[in-house]
Amino acid sequence: MDVAESPERDPHSPEDEEQPQGLSDDDILRDSGSDQDLDGAGVRASDLEDEESAARGPSQEEEDNHSDEEDRASEPKSQDQDSEVNELSRGPTSSPCEEEGDEGEEDRTSDLRDEASSVTRELDEHELDYDEEVPEEPAPAVQEDEAEKAGAEDDEEKGEGTPREEGKAGVQSVGEKESLEAAKEKKKEDDDGEIDDGEIDDDDLEEGEVKDPSDRKVRPRPTCRFFMKGNCTWGMNCRFIHPGVNDKGNYSLITKADPFPPNGAPPLGPHPLMPANPWGGPVVDEILPPPPPEPPTESAWERGLRHAKEVLKKATIRKEQEPDFEEKRFTVTIGEDEREFDKENEVFRDWNSRIPRDVRDTVLEPYADPYYDYEIERFWRGGQYENFRVQYTETEPYHNYRERERERERENRQRERERERERDRERERRQRERERERERERDKERQRRKEEWERERAKRDEKDRQHRDRDREKEREKEKGKPKPRSPQPPSRQAEPPKKEAATTGPQVKRADEWKDPWRRSKSPKKKLGVSVSPSRARRRRKTSASSASASNSSRSSSRSSSYSGSGSSRSRSRSSSYSSYSSRSSRHSSFSGSRSRSRSFSSSPSPSPTPSPHRPSIRTKGEPAPPPGKAGEKSVKKPAPPPAPPQATKTTAPVPEPTKPGDPREARRKERPARTPPRRRTLSGSGSGSGSSYSGSSSRSRSLSVSSVSSVSSATSSSSSAHSVDSEDMYADLASPVSSASSRSPAPAQTRKEKGKSKKEDGVKEEKRKRDSSTQPPKSAKPPAGGKSSQQPSTPQQAPPGQPQQGTFVAHKEIKLTLLNKAADKGSRKRYEPSDKDRQSPPPAKRPNTSPDRGSRDRKSGGRLGSPKPERQRGQNSKAPAAPADRKRQLSPQSKSSSKVTSVPGKASDPGAASTKSGKASTLSRREELLKQLKAVEDAIARKRAKIPGKA
């Protein structure tokens, strides 16, 4: 104990009497054996009692809790109480030694702050318990036992006593020790209550087990020597281990088969730490090799564990071998039913279910702790396994055995029930599966019949479509013939007519329409888009007044989507109207050709009308009365009024009118167009998505193609048809303009969305296009007919690719398309439009400022491309070749997404297109050839796709 270690005490000082506690149990027992020196017993006893009370407290506290805080807090209390106890126990006789005792106590309290406090505390709380419970005569024995216990604890647990045990034992005479014990007895007899209070310390603390269960768990407690002798009066309350009785930790519920007889019969072997006979047994007994209470306990546990592991292994093997092991494993382990039957043991059930599943060896080994082992044994003691019980061959250690047997029976019953249920379930499952299989077979038969019918219908439809396509193609050809005269650029268009690519240039518009006619054919089977139907009507209407055509087309496209309505009208004007969705493109192409002005006004209005209106307004800044986006398309169709033309000019076309001047044919066209172009512009301005087309349209009214290509950009839907119509602008516009492409591919609504989504971008792009058109239109106006469309096509590709990346949603489809278009168109553009490309380069920056942030992003792309004239030229040159593939892709991906993606691009591309028109008709032939090839390829691809889609549609 700390007491012995206190610096003030010399081995021989009166405090030495306290040391016996520090001494080993053997020494204490030896001394206790003889009652020889009674002289000074009172003093020694008093001191010893003080020390015992302190020592017991510390020992207990070590066992229970070495909480320094509690001890320190109670320090003063402990000192006072110890002093009181000492005084009372000493009585008047011990007064001379009180000073020493007090000093010793002060030292002890300082040294034993932790230990003494709990002792004193519990003394106060339980002072009376000892007297009531223990008779006076046994009390001395108990006290001695306690003292020895304290010593034993100190020896076992602390090891502090070890140095003291032998050395101090030698120092102290046996007589002193004996006198200590005699004094103890005397004092107990004299002052039983008080001394008992001191003793009660230990006992109450033992009862205090409840207070400090955690510490007791953690620290092994010394075995109770008195229990080993059979003398322990504390019974279950004893704070030392009674091997079979209270050594189970907190779980006294689980009774262990104790290595030691519960009655206090002689221990299996001499207790290692506690001498067999504290009263006078030979020291040799104490020294005898200990059968430690816990080691025997451990051995018993080990035995039990080993047995349990074996049983578990067997059980697991059997379970694994059972055919329905998996089912049982999942269904039988812990069913809801089982829990209902045995709710008390729910936890155990869970354990049972878990343990068998896991590797048992690993599971059981971790629980060397008796508590866990017991629990686990208990868990798998119950019939965890369906086919066998886990039982010990050993005598049942549990008192709960009968209950467990009942539980097992219940579990077995439950398992049987579960098995029956499982069998029923399996039967039901099989029946259901059979029924399902039959149903599947029936469904397959039905599907086969339906497929056969569908095939037959498809064949019939294909035949009908072919007839329709032929009619449409004829109509288109007729319409193409008309658009040529319409456009002041007829020569170029006529030159291009043989080549659908040529249609891209203003003169080529007719060819573009022819080009679109094949597209129409491919799409005509897919009237679902509504494009195929409207195109034929659009052609007829083209033949009729442009306004009527635009109106009809606009109505059709509007049916598809508000944005398309405008584009549809413009398409109807140009052959490209073959696709109502493309009509915006074709209308632009038409506008390039004689019908160009008309289609322009309408086309711009429709494509812009849907979504672009918000962006348009920025474009409208020039005072164009922009019709509301929804109304813009129709209004533009209705009001291709010349008044809008001026606004258009003012808007994007402020520059456009100037470009108009450069080319007389352009000017004438522009003059023709102004009525329509203004509406178009207006519509474009009115509708955000249309705005792109309106920009290019208004700016290059003369170069109306480029503008319309911009609008076509807004009406990306028409892009595929326009691309097929070979208006280069239309092609790229289709790619660029979400509306046209969307309408061609998907119903107007998708286009409208895309137009709206991209209208902002398109507006920026279109503004740029307008600027470009204004810059490029002068050259374009010079050669609007022949070069206009082809140039626009290449230009559109250029713009389209920049726009494509921005149009993230559809970028994948359109980017590809645009890229192809860019190459072909850019090549053409370079050849024709290097000057116009340069012009464009300057415009894009201006356009960029005008463009909204979305526009800005597109402008950056377009601007970057425009900024580098060479790339634009390259695009212009390449745009033709790529244009066809782009058109194909557009058609292939008719979804409005791709069209909307392209939307931003078309405006940009259209500007290069304008430049390309400018570059001259010289390159138009080569471009036409390239474009024709591309368009044919695109047509083929589109036809294939349509062939696939029509069946789907």
Curated annotation (Swiss-Prot):
Residues 15-26, 60-72, 97-106, 125-136, 143-158, 191-207 have a biased composition (Acidic residues). Residues 916-925 have a biased composition (Polar residues). The modification N-acetylmethionine is found at residue 1. Transmembrane segments: none annotated. GO terms for cellular component: nuclear speck; protein-containing complex; ribonucleoprotein complex. Residues 545-606, 692-725, 736-750, 778-798, 893-906 have a biased composition (Low complexity). It holds the Pfam family zf-CCCH_4. Keywords: Acetylation, Coiled coil, Isopeptide bond, Metal-binding, Nucleus, Phosphoprotein, Ubl conjugation, Zinc, Zinc-finger. It is found in: Nucleus. One of its GO terms (molecular function) is mRNA cap binding complex binding. A zinc finger (C3H1-type) spans 219-245. The modification Phosphoserine is found at residues 6, 34, 46, 53, 59, 67, 74, 78, 83, 95, 110, 118, 173, 179, 487, 532, 534, 536, 842, 852, 868, 893, 896. Residues 1-14, 107-124, 159-168, 175-190, 208-217, 396-482, 510-520, 661-670, 760-774, 824-841 have a biased composition (Basic and acidic residues). The modification Phosphothreonine is found at residues 109, 162. Residues 105-134, 399-464, 921-950 form a coiled coil. This is Zinc finger CCCH domain-containing protein 18. It comes from Homo sapiens. The gene is ZC3H18.
